[in-house]
Amino acid sequence: MGNNSTWSQSENLTADKQKEKLQPPSMYNVVLNNDDYTPMEFVIDVLQKFFSYDIERATQLMLTVHYQGKAICGVFSAEVAETKVVQVNRYARENEHPLLCTLEKA
């Protein structure tokens, strides 16, 4: 009987580990923050280029950034969100704009 008890405990531990592994990844909001210098057209370009929005949705989000101070551009896993933030910030600097893209836990 000792062996059956040990086997049962081992199965329970394995089941617990599988449940832990099946948790969905943490998600993060990628956020564009308003500034007084970046042209609206550039923000629209960023939203189309890095987030694949059409012109109408990109314009709506740009106006949200402009009037509300920030807008969520998308919700992604940590790795994808970090990559988007780096890409957008690099693109803004290369084009000499102070546009700031950040991430926050969703």
Curated annotation (Swiss-Prot):
UniProt region (Disordered), positions on chain: 1-21
Gene Ontology annotations of biological process type: protein catabolic process; proteolysis
InterPro entries: ClpS (IPR022935), ClpS_core (IPR003769), Ribosomal_bL12_C/ClpS-like (IPR014719)
Bias (Polar residues): 1-13
Pfam families cross-referenced by the UniProt entry: ClpS
Subunit structure: Binds to the N-terminal domain of the chaperone ClpA.
Function, as annotated: Involved in the modulation of the specificity of the ClpAP-mediated ATP-dependent protein degradation.
Record NCBIfam families: PRK00033.1-3, PRK00033.1-5
Sequence similarity: Belongs to the ClpS family.
Protein name (database record): ATP-dependent Clp protease adapter protein ClpS
Species the sequence originates in: Pectobacterium carotovorum subsp. carotovorum (strain PC1)
